[in-house]
UniProtKB/Swiss-Prot annotation:
Sugar-bearing residue positions: N320
Topological domain spans for side Virion surface: 2-181, 275-348, 399-400
Pfam families reported for this sequence: vMSA
Record topology, Intravirion segments: 2-253, 203-253, 370-375
Location in the cell: Virion membrane
Keyword entries, A-Z: Acetylation, Caveolin-mediated endocytosis of virus by host, Fusion of virus membrane with host endosomal membrane, Fusion of virus membrane with host membrane, Glycoprotein, Host-virus interaction, Lipoprotein, Membrane, Myristate, Transmembrane, Transmembrane helix, Viral attachment to host cell, Viral envelope protein, Viral penetration into host cytoplasm, Virion, Virus endocytosis by host, Virus entry into host cell
Region annotation (Disordered) ranges: 84-116
Protein name: Large envelope protein
Domains (record comment): The large envelope protein is synthesized with the pre-S region at the cytosolic side of the endoplasmic reticulum and, hence will be within the virion after budding. Therefore the pre-S region is not N-glycosylated. Later a post-translational translocation of N-terminal pre-S and TM1 domains occur in about 50% of proteins at the virion surface. These molecules change their topology by an unknown mechanism, resulting in exposure of pre-S region at virion surface.
GO cellular component, one term: virion membrane
Amino acid sequence: MGGRLPKPRKGMGTNLSVPNPLGFFPDHQLDPAFGANSNNPDWDFNPIKDHWPQANQVGVGAFGPGFTPPHGGVLGWSPQAQGTLTTVPAVPPPASTNRQSGRQPTPISPPLRDSHPQAMQWNSTKFHQTLQDPRVRGLYFPAGGSSSGTVNPAPNIASHISSISSRIGDPAPTMENITSGFLGPLLVLQAGFFLLTRILTIPQSLDSWWTSLNFLGEAPVCLGQNSQSPTSNHSPTSCPPICPGYRWMCLRRFIIFLFILLLCLIFLLVLLDCQGMLPVCPLIPGSTTTSTGPCRTCTTPAQGNSMFPSCCCTKPTDGNCTCIPIPSSWAFAKYLWEWASVRFSWLSLLVPFVQWFVGLSPTVWLSVIWMMWYWGPSLYNILSPFIPLLPIFFCLWVYI
């Protein structure tokens, strides 16, 4: 009967030394830290083991409610980790040293009459009474305003107001003024950078359009390749410096730059002529001599004192002058038309056609718009490289 005690069952949830309500803690005999070996296989039935009476006490532990590890858990060997909850009352520091460190209390603000005496001596009532003074009203309402009369303010009133202004100072700049002062130049800089990047793409786009005319229906390939300087297949608009077609690419882009400059100058000339800033004397039929200087004896008085001459004087052989007024706008265009009409007489036959075209019915204009819509995509492919020039023309039109 005094034989060996029966061996308990193995497995999860069979630890008899501690309450294990959750059932997922292994037996102690599986852990070598508790001394399980061949001589002492059953640690739970060892008569000389510590029964750990603290394990039966349910308290706050490290592994959840209902279980307290007797030998300390992952939180250490402190009383709180062992399941013993101890509360140590916090002793406040002495009153003498309570405010020696840290932020000091904010003192009570002094009365307004002590901290800002100028605000007490210059209140709203006194301010309005001063404004009712005719001498002060004359300072704010000059002659012709709502004031009954304009009187120079007395020196004492002016000095008093200036002293108040010097004490108060200028108003602080608001965030709105600061923001508007910064946003304007930034927007101009951003728009200028965008236009610059778009303008730099104009020569390459025109170069691609120019070279595509030589390869209708085919992919453009550089024609400068040969056996002496072999290069890989590339577009004629991006030739490397070692390619014989590089010099032709530079020549094309130089011509394109000159063409763009010519377009800008033509637009500027048209704009100045439209605003009447080109006082060009028109050609007088049957006469080839014109003079913009003032005439002494004219059939029409000449106005030679203005910035631009308002009439042109012709001096025929009889000594009398004939003055013809300069058009207020499109003077240069009319001069070119008259000059071309004298050189090419057939241009005068186009005048009735132009007048008829201007007086067309809306149906004809709708037909023209429909044709432009039909040919629009192809025209867009042709005119798309010139689209970045439109903002430049618009700026010239607005600011000149």
